[in-house]
């Protein structure tokens, strides 16, 4: 059974849009750096859902959307590892991971 036959296009695009909006809202309103990283991952997953959806509905002969998703997942994993390492370093130095207390220009 193909993925395209299970869900309607509108449902998957709506799911991707909701996840993107929730992640973006969380990204711009979060005060915690770890929460901001999690919201950024949610935004990237919404983009992945849209890539796979468009690939399955409009480009059934090729797997270009899935290849883009693999690249995005690899970049997201590296981004999460580097981001968490930066957060850990900032916590060791400042004893806080709140974004409003974080200013390297001092």
From Swiss-Prot:
Keywords: Chloroplast, Membrane, NAD, NADP, Plastid, Plastoquinone, Quinone, Thylakoid, Translocase, Transmembrane, Transmembrane helix, Transport. The lineage of its organism: Eukaryota, Viridiplantae, Streptophyta, Embryophyta, Tracheophyta. It holds the Pfam family Oxidored_q2. One of its GO terms (biological process) is ATP synthesis coupled electron transport. The chain crosses the membrane at residues 6-26, 34-54, 67-87. It is found in: Plastid, Chloroplast thylakoid membrane. NDH shuttles electrons from NAD(P)H:plastoquinone, via FMN and iron-sulfur (Fe-S) centers, to quinones in the photosynthetic chain and possibly in a chloroplast respiratory chain. The immediate electron acceptor for the enzyme in this species is believed to be plastoquinone. Couples the redox reaction to proton translocation, and thus conserves the redox energy in a proton gradient. NDH is composed of at least 16 different subunits, 5 of which are encoded in the nucleus. Belongs to the complex I subunit 4L family. GO terms for cellular component: chloroplast thylakoid membrane; NADH dehydrogenase complex. The gene is ndhE. It comes from the Eukaryota. It comes from Psilotum nudum (Whisk fern). One of its GO terms (molecular function) is oxidoreductase activity, acting on NAD(P)H, quinone or similar compound as acceptor. It catalyses: a plastoquinone + NADH + (n+1) H(+)(in) = a plastoquinol + NAD(+) + n H(+)(out); a plastoquinone + NADPH + (n+1) H(+)(in) = a plastoquinol + NADP(+) + n H(+)(out). It is a multi-pass membrane protein. This is NAD(P)H-quinone oxidoreductase subunit 4L, chloroplastic. It is an enzyme of class 7 (translocase). Its EC number is 7.1.1.-.
């Amino acid at each position: 059974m193909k993925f395209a036959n299970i869900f309607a296009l509108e449902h998957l695009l709506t799911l991707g849009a909701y996840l993107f909006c929730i992640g973006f809202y969380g990204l711009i309103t979060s005060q915690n750096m770890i929460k901001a990283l999690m919201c950024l991952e949610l935004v990237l997953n919404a983009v992945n859902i849209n890539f796979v959806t468009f690939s399955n509905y409009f480009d059934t002969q090729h797997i270009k959307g899935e290849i883009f998703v693999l690249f995005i997942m690899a970049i997201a994993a590296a981004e999460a590892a580097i981001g968490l390492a930066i957060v850990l370093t900032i916590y060791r130095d400042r004893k806080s991971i709140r974004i409003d207390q974080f200013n390297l220009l001092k």
